[in-house]
């Protein structure tokens, strides 16, 4: 059992191996040590169990949770802050990013509505530090009609993040008509290409796992 999974079980969050089994995967894929001083944002507070799990595992870090339910303020404690607002509100997301960002780790465990997931990513990924991580949890809702989902349906979170795979390989997209001498020079491409707007150049990798998507910032 991983340390994170053990802590998750103690707090009763559904991220543990007793339910979704995300925490074992996080210890494998997240590039952080327990003693790192991280700035963490989690979308979706619910009963506060996940926030407490992050706090106890990353014990030197500051945790921010956001939720639309005002009752979630009760889960504030040392090194845990809770702000009330919607992940589908650009002004709210901008304000919390200015107040608390940039972030080392963002976890979207919010409404799981596909439009909300895509919207939050577009608003918040710019506020992830270089080398930081953005996680989308419970991405299986991309296939469920009640969450605006469907198999191969355009604009679901799964289809949105699939499309970003091309952006991970932006060198090929931007360099197809340039001298090959520059093919391995990402800094040159970023500084000199006139086609930067055609794709994101800030995504290092995207990992699709069972139930979660992990995006690493370049």
List each language-model region with its residue ranges.
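A short alpha-helical cap/connector motif
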Residues: 1-107, 111-136, 140-218
């Amino acid at each position: 059992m991983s340390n994170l999974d053990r802590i998750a079980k103690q707090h009763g969050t559904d991220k543990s191996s007793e339910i979704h089994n995300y925490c074992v995967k996080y210890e494998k894929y997240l590039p952080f040590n327990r003693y790192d001083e991280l700035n963490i944002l989690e979308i979706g507070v619910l009963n506060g169990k996940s926030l407490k799990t992050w706090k106890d595992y990353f014990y030197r870090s500051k945790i921010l949770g956001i939720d639309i339910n005002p009752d979630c303020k009760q889960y504030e404690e040392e090194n845990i802050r809770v702000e009330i607002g919607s992940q589908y509100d650009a002004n709210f997301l901008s304000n919390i990013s200015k107040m608390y960002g940039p972030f080392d780790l963002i976890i979207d465990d919010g409404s799981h509505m596909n439009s909300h997931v895509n919207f939050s990513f577009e608003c918040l990924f710019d506020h992830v530090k270089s080398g930081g991580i953005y996680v989308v949890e419970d991405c299986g809702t991309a296939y469920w009609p009640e969450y605006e989902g469907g198999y191969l349906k355009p604009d679901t979170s799964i289809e949105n993040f699939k499309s970003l795979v091309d952006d991970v390989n932006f060198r090929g997209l931007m360099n197809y008509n340039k001298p090959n001498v520059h093919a391995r020079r990402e800094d040159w491409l970023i500084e000199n290409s006139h086609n930067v707007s055609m794709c994101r150049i800030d995504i290092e990798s995207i990992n699709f796992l069972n139930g979660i998507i992990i995006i690493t910032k370049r």
